[in-house]
Structure formats: structure tokens, C-alpha cells
């Protein structure tokens, strides 16, 4: 996937969700630190609407994460993580906002 960076090794049970929108890569330091102990995904937001970003995150999680996953969201990414969990509760085990 073009809109995804991975850190560590599978299984990828954690996804770090950046702020912005438009701050792709912002969560890379967090992802690198967490990857010492677990596989981490860093989805990069490319859609322009909130609905599009929720569906994009859903698609990334379904394709690449060990579900249900832990979402670590910062700023805009915290809100997006919360919305993803609300719309797709089966995909999310925990939220860290």
C-alpha cells in the first residue's frame, strides 16, 4: 500500500494515526519506539473528506493489521481514531488518544 509505512515485524497490532490533516510522518518517532516491542502500522491520510479518511483507515486496518488493533491517535488522528472505532468497533481493541 502506498499510504502505509510499517515498523517492526508482523503481526501489526498497533496503528499510529497522525495529526493534521496533512502531517504525514508526524507519528514516525512514536512508531519507531513502539516497534522495539511490536509491529506498528503508520497509515498516511490521503483522502480529503472525513468519511474518506475513516474508510481509508478501515481499509488499511483490514488489509494489514492484526485485528482488533490498538489505535494511537494524536490531534486530528485522535479524532479520526475515535470515529473509526465508533463506526467500526470490531476493528479496534483499544484507543490511546
Task: Write out the residue ranges for each language-model feature.
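Conserved HGGG/HGGXW glycine-rich cap/lid loop of the alpha/beta-hydrolase fold
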Residues: 2-50
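Short alpha-helix within the catalytic core of nucleotide-sugar-dependent glycosyltransferases
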Residues: 28, 54, 86
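Short Gly/charged-rich anion-binding patches and loops
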Residues: 29, 56, 80
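A structural signal for short coil/turn segments at secondary-structure junctions
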Residues: 35-38, 64-65, 88
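Active-site loop/oxyanion-hole signature of alpha/beta-hydrolase fold enzymes
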Residues: 41-72, 76
Amino acid at each position: 500500500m502506498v499510504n502505509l509505512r510499517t515498523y517492526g515485524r508482523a503481526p501489526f497490532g498497533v496503528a499510529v494515526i497522525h495529526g493534521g490533516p496533512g502531517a504525514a510522518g508526524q507519528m514516525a518517532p512514536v512508531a519507531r519506539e513502539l516497534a522495539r516491542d511490536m509491529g506498528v502500522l503508520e497509515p498516511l491520510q490521503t483522502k480529503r473528506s472525513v468519511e474518506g479518511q475513516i474508510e481509508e483507515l478501515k481499509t488499511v486496518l483490514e488489509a494489514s493489521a492484526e485485528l482488533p488493533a490498538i489505535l494511537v491517535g494524536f490531534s486530528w488522528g485522535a479524532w479520526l481514531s475515535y470515529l473509526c472505532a465508533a463506526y467500526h468497533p470490531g476493528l479496534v481493541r483499544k484507543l490511546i488518544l
